[in-house]
Structures are given as structure tokens and as C-alpha cells.
Amino acid sequence: MAVPKRRTSKTRKNKRRTHFKISVPGMTECPNCGREYKLSHRVCKNCGSYNGEEVAAK
């Protein structure tokens, strides 16, 4: 069975983990009402529009 010869140092462990990070969500200003930021490809909570059309009644 494979066993590590030496203990992994904190520096080596942290260098390996540099890519494990949370990315910022893509927020855009609503083109219809312009008052609220919304996630991309989702309905605006303020005006209920998506892709220039009203899809959710307020």
C-alpha cells in the first residue's frame, strides 16, 4: 500500500488549493427597469421581465 514518505507541508497544501475558490456571480443591471441587479439568464424580481418580455406578473 502506498504511504507518503513525508508529511505534506502547509505551504505545499495551500499552493495546491489556490484554485479552489468561489467565483463571483455574473450580475447585470436589468435592461427593462434599470433599478435592480439580477443574475444573468434569470427573471428580474422587480419588474418580472426576461429577455425584453414580461414573463412574470407582479
UniProtKB/Swiss-Prot annotation:
Annotated family: Belongs to the bacterial ribosomal protein bL32 family.
UniProt GO molecular function: structural constituent of ribosome
Gene Ontology terms: biological process: translation
One GO CC annotation: large ribosomal subunit
Pfam families recorded: Ribosomal_L32p
Listed InterPro entries: Ribosomal_bL32, Ribosomal_bL32_bact, Ribosomal_zn-bd
Natural source organism: Staphylococcus aureus (strain NCTC 8325 / PS 47)
Keyword list, A-Z: Ribonucleoprotein, Ribosomal protein
This protein's name: Large ribosomal subunit protein bL32
